[in-house]
UniProtKB/Swiss-Prot annotation:
Protein's name in the database: UPF0502 protein YceH
Gene: yceH
NCBIfam families the UniProt entry points to: PRK11239.1 (NF008413)
Family designation: Belongs to the UPF0502 family.
PANTHER family noted in UniProt: UPF0502 PROTEIN YCEH
UniProt organism field: Salmonella newport (strain SL254)
Transmembrane segments: none
InterPro entries: DUF480, WH-like_DNA-bd_sf, WH_DNA-bd_sf
Length: 215
């Protein structure tokens, strides 16, 4: 495994992967766009409050490591960023649409159950059933160039095991257990969060459209 991202780098890459699929008309993203995406209060765990300077430092580091590239074509007054983390022309990591959706959701929200992942990743890929989610996770866990995810030990009193990505190195399961949010209705919460995320995306699109009309 050659990926050793910090938590903030994982957030930046996760945001770019997400916006590439969910709001392609706004992609690539400017620094301000990345800041807004990183600090979203929906579909993010933990919620962050990064400054523009902090995000710029992460972007510069990721460009140097060839995980991102800058885009500044004709008529672009602002430098924008696009991901080269996966499925890029010269990159080694190739993922299916289902794999991208799960990896992105894990980068943005940490350890989750297959049920939570199916609900939360639905804006990026519509999984036909739980079997597809689980088989995709198993592929990511058993790839020869990986593994990219790991199945965690099932916690006492929980019906499902959670999965975590390995792009930030090995997983400290004890730390994850102590920081895991308690929820008696995880599936309902996931659906509410998915709806909140859709509303946030629509608001972002509307703001972008209004800003464009005002130019």
């Amino acid at each position: 495994m050659k990926y050793e991202l910090t938590a903030t780098e994982a957030r930046v890459i996760g945001c770019l992967l997400e916006k590439q699929v969910t709001t392609p008309e706004q992609y690539p993203l400017s620094v301000n766009g990345v800041v807004t995406a990183c600090n979203q209060k929906t579909n993010r765990e933990p919620v962050m409050n990064l400054t523009e300077q902090e995000v710029q430092e992460q972007l510069d580091n990721l460009v140097k490591r060839h995980f991102l590239r800058t885009v500044s074509g004709f008529g672009n007054r602002v430098t924008k960023y696009e991901q080269r983390f996966c499925n890029s022309e010269f990159g080694d990591l190739k993922l299916s649409a289902a794999e991208v959706a799960l990896v992105t959701t894990l980068l943005l929200r940490g350890a989750q159950t297959p049920g939570e992942l199916r609900s939360r990743a639905s804006r990026m890929h519509e999984f036909s059933d739980m079997t597809e989610v689980e088989s995709t996770l198993e592929r990511l866990a058993s790839r020869e160039d990986g593994p990219y995810v790991v199945r965690l030990a099932r916690e006492p009193g929980k019906r499902e095991s959670r999965y975590m990505h390995l792009f930030c190195g090995d997983v400290d399961e004890l730390s994850l257990q102590t920081s895991a949010p308690e929820s008696a209705s995880g599936d309902l919460q996931s659906r509410v969060e998915a709806l909140e995320s859709e509303v946030a995306e629509l608001k972002q699109r509307l703001d972008s459209l209004l800003a464009h009309l005002g130019e």
